[in-house]
Amino acid sequence: GSTVESYQEKAAGMDQAIIKKVMDEAKQYNGEVMRSSVQLTDPFKVKRLDGEMVHYNRILNIDGSSIMGYLKIPCISINLPIYHGTSGTVLEHGIGHLAASSFPIGGKDTHAVLTGHTGLSSAKIFTDLTEMKKGDFFFIHVLDKKLAYRVDQITVVEPQDTKELQIMEGKDHVTLVTCTPYGVNDKRLLVRGVRTAYHAKEEEIRARNHHSQWM
């Protein structure tokens, strides 16, 4: 099975008490992120202190695989694991989580930043992020939590411009980040979602097929 399937199986078999403990650690981390004024940097150029990373890498890492959950974007057929950190190896296989941002577990005063490559020959990852529109949904599964986000803002910024990635008081945001334009990659495409109620049926919608729209 896929990486996502093995994560699903592992999470499904976990004891509720352990899930609660793991989630509490992540919430605590998110509280620290909110209170700290760490300047976020371009996710494609992250350098963190090793000591902090050890602590960070242990949180939400249920089977030592460094996968914290998975991201589904039905309208562009994405279903990919979310890994700790944004190292080169991580970004070749899936979605990276920017360590200085909130863990993607939802809650007020959180803003998780998830990063993926565009134009990798080996995998599509975030190549189709440019197809997303305001009002589209994406979903994050972490252990037994299912979170839904509705795209409310799409911006293109310079790599060092991270103000759109900051936490907004009282809000629950996730921003998906990739390099743009295709082949040049000198800007960052930011697709931000705001938390909304989760409905399983929205996760089942089929991908938009651009080619057959008019047939």
Please report, for each region that a protein language model flagged, where it lies by residue.
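Solvent-exposed, non-transmembrane regions of membrane-associated and secreted proteins
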Residues: G1-K133, F137-M215
